Regions:
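Patatin-like phospholipase
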Residues: 1-37, 45-288
Length: 288
């Protein structure tokens, strides 16, 4: 039985996901396949590396630094509201202040994937851990490059934006990879109905060089709602288990308040016992 783990993106809302992942680490849950989107992909990397509390530190301890995000970061990084180079190169790379354990990821037999969106084609591109380098985590810069808030990231001659623009919750990809069961971590309630993107005039102007990206954002809510409906049906059949906030989060993608982000992390810790028994039964063959 092959077990997958899918982690939705959501910027700072993924502080919730980080709490869930820490509790899963404590319970010794070991999936065969992990795929994440945007901040969810970065959270998945720390999970596969076995670095408990690392994700929380990035959401809570470092968030107020001017280099991290905000207008200071925007001007220092020449156009990124999230200073992706600071987060995923300076901090995360080998020798960085809170480096990702590259060796642990490579030694772990678990597959690790991150979704980005090709800026020219608008299609998802799936990076795996063979694309990582201890001194270069451009993959995570790419999957987190939110349109408008960030410039696209170039990898091997191609430009990429946030993976959520093309495959927000990549459960189908996990199933195609041979997963029999999939744990899905959301940072929205499981009954969420996503609305059309706001600021359409703004993104249509700023992304005019990337018409496929504009189309993706125009229809993103429709695709997301279809995907979530399909996942709920998989859960009814016993092929998926959804872990999601019990109430809609007040945190936004761009929240910088460390107290609020710590509360969100703590919310995940508090809610985890409500799903724990079902989760342990669901993945009973993948617990060490």
């Amino acid at each position: 039985m092959r077990l997958g783990l899918v982690i939705e993106g959501g910027g700072m809302k993924c502080a919730y996901s980080s709490g869930i992942l820490d509790m899963m680490m404590d319970d010794g849950i070991k999936p065969d396949y992990v795929i994440g989107v945007s901040a969810g992909a970065a959270c998945g990397a720390s999970f596969v590396a076995g670095q408990r509390d690392r994700n929380r530190r990035f959401f809570v301890d470092y968030v107020e630094r001017p280099e991290y995000m905000g207008w200071t970061a925007f001007f220092r990084s020449k156009g990124n509201f999230f200073n992706l180079e600071y987060i995923y190169q300076d901090m995360t790379g080998a020798g960085g202040e809170d480096a990702l354990d590259y060796d642990a990821i490579m030694k772990n037999p678990c597959e690790l994937w991150a979704v980005a969106t090709d800026a020219e084609t608008g299609k998802p591109y799936y990076f795996n851990k063979s694309d990582l380098h201890p001194y270069d985590y451009s993959v995570y810069m790419a999957t987190c490059a939110i349109p408008i808030a960030c410039r696209p990231v170039k990898i091997n001659g191609h430009l990429y934006f946030d993976g959520g623009c093309s495959d927000s919750v990549p459960v189908r990809r996990a199933l195609e990879a041979g997963c029999d069961k999939v744990i899905v971590i959301l940072c929205r309630t499981k009954d969420t109905v996503r609305e059309p993107e706001k600021h359409q005039r703004l993104y249509r102007t700023l992304l005019r060089r990337y018409p496929k990206m504009i189309h993706n954002l125009d229809v993103r809510h429709e695709k997301y709602n279809r995907t979530l409906n399909a996942i709920r049906k998989l859960e009814e059949k016993g092929h998926a288990l959804i872990i999601a906030p019990e109430k809609q989060l007040e945190i936004t993608t761009y929240t910088r308040d460390p107290k609020e982000l710590q509360k969100l992390y703590d919310t995940a810790i508090r809610e985890y016992p409500h799903i724990r028994e079902r989760l342990l039964t669901f993945c009973e063959d993948h617990i060490e």
